[in-house]
Swiss-Prot record:
This is High zinc activated nuclear receptor protein. Belongs to the nuclear hormone receptor family. One of its GO terms (biological process) is intracellular zinc ion homeostasis. Disruption phenotype: In the presence of excess dietary zinc, reduced transcription of genes such as cdf-2, ttm-1b and mtl-1, which are required for zinc homeostasis, and retarded growth as compared to wild-type.
Length: 413
């Protein structure tokens, strides 16, 4: 008599990896991890190559070693590609209590998929009458949502359709996971800037590359400082800085960040010595200054706008320089209007703008320090920088050896 598969206890083992199955996924009794792997492979159209002869063992403890054989097993056991398509198209119509399993082996392409979903949700909200700052606010909110999602993808295998993450206790960050998320973050930021940091999208490709390469270094380190300030605002003795992977680095334990990391070729202590001064500077100068002036998000985004629209960036066309100057003026005007709406008088507005802009040279010094530290670390082969991070060096040419399509990795056809 054929077994009825309605009771989870009657599902038996996963047909793919042989661990306990928890449901019928894509017409096959399987576990969430294998279902998520199959879904991700199909949606992102990933191709795998077996390094052996196509007969690798696929079981719970070894299922991640050969993705080619794992995917082949999925197909051979009867998983249906067309069912993945149907489920993907109905993401927005699922009940908020449901969950989608995502394979934790995260790639930047997943970030692009998440970005597309969020963008579709936001497009109806934005209108052509939005100011530069309000568009940036919407884009930054979407960026934070996606980044929380990418952190969860790296740390676990479950994500809700609405991408509202449960509160997770802070954990000590590690080099490998931070590098993984940072690589994805670079692609996310290109998409956010291109879509929401008006009028960036109107620039020629070469001008986009020049401005973005300069901007991303500012954004990456400034956002760590800003998020650290927000997280530990009331703690004047805070000695931790938040990292892109959702974890933190403690000032006195920087060496732990580099322990047992695949891309680090020296001792954790030696790697820490290279970057300790920059970490101290971020905490003692930038985060401390943000705390003293009680910076708010609108001011922070205006600051990012000034860093992006730098007309002194080498290689800009005349048109781009002119647009940068115009956008700077518009940002200043919008910032003044914002302060006026907060009932500040002319003197208070002038003082506040001055206090805010005094942060820019501090950010510039931090960027210079970190660039010099990175060059030194690579010179002595202390660690391996991924291809995306290498592209953001001041004197680096654009390296197109990247699987994702973003501003700094796409040729101008």
């Amino acid at each position: 008599m054929q077994k009825v598969m309605n009771d989870p206890e009657d599902l038996g083992n996963c047909k793919i990896c042989l661990q306990r199955a928890d449901g019928i996924h894509f017409a096959v009794s399987s576990c969430r991890a294998c279902a998520a792997f199959f879904r991700r492979t199909v949606i992102l159209k990933l191709n795998y190559t077996c390094k052996e002869k196509g007969n690798c063992t696929v079981e719970k403890s070894l299922r991640n070693l050969c993705r080619s054989c794992r995917y082949t097993r999925c197909i051979n056991e009867g998983m249906k590609i067309e069912l993945v398509q149907l489920q993907r198209d109905s993401i927005g119509r699922k009940k908020s209590g449901a969950s989608i399993s995502i394979d934790p082996l995260f790639t930047p392409n997943v970030a692009s998929s998440l970005s597309a979903i969020f963008k579709n949700e936001k497009e109806d909200v934005l209108s052509t009458s939005c100011t530069i700052l309000s568009q940036m606010t919407s884009g930054y909110a979407m960026f934070l949502n996606i980044r929380r999602s990418t952190n969860t993808l790296v740390q676990s295998s479950v994500i809700t359709p609405t991408f509202k993450m449960p509160k997770i206790e802070l954990h000590a960050s590690r080099f490998d996971s931070a590098k993984q998320v940072c690589k994805a973050e670079a692609h996310l930021v290109t998409d956010i800037v291109n879509s929401y940091f008006s009028p960036f999208n109107s620039l020629k490709f070469e001008d986009k590359v020049a401005l973005f390469k300069n901007f991303f270094c500012y954004f990456s380190h400034t956002d760590r400082a800003y998020q650290s300030f927000k997280q530990f605002e009331s703690d004047n003795l805070n000695d931790k800085i938040l990292m892109p992977d959702g974890g933190f680095i403690k000032r006195t334990e920087l060496g732990r960040f580099y322990e047992n990391a695949e891309g680090v070729h020296t001792s954790a202590e030696d790697a820490a010595k290279i970057f300790q001064p920059a970490l101290n500077y971020i905490l003692d100068v930038i985060v401390d200054y943000m705390r003293r002036i009680h910076i708010i998000e609108t001011e922070y985004l205006a600051l990012l706008g000034f860093c992006l629209w730098d007309d002194a960036v080498p290689g800009l066309s005349k048109e781009a320089k002119s647009l940068a100057v115009q956008t700077q003026s518009k940002l200043l005007a919008e910032l003044q209007n914002f302060y006026s709406s907060q009932n500040k008088d002319a003197v208070e507005i002038t003082q506040r703008v001055g206090v805010l802009l005094l942060l820019v040279p501090k950010l510039t010094k931090c960027v210079i320090m970190l660039r010099e530290n990175s060059v030194l670390a690579e010179l002595f082969n202390y660690y391996e920088a991924d291809v995306c991070c290498k592209n953001f060096k001041e004197d680096a040419s654009v390296d197109l050896d990247c699987t994702s399509q973003c501003i700094v990795h796409t040729k101008n056809d």
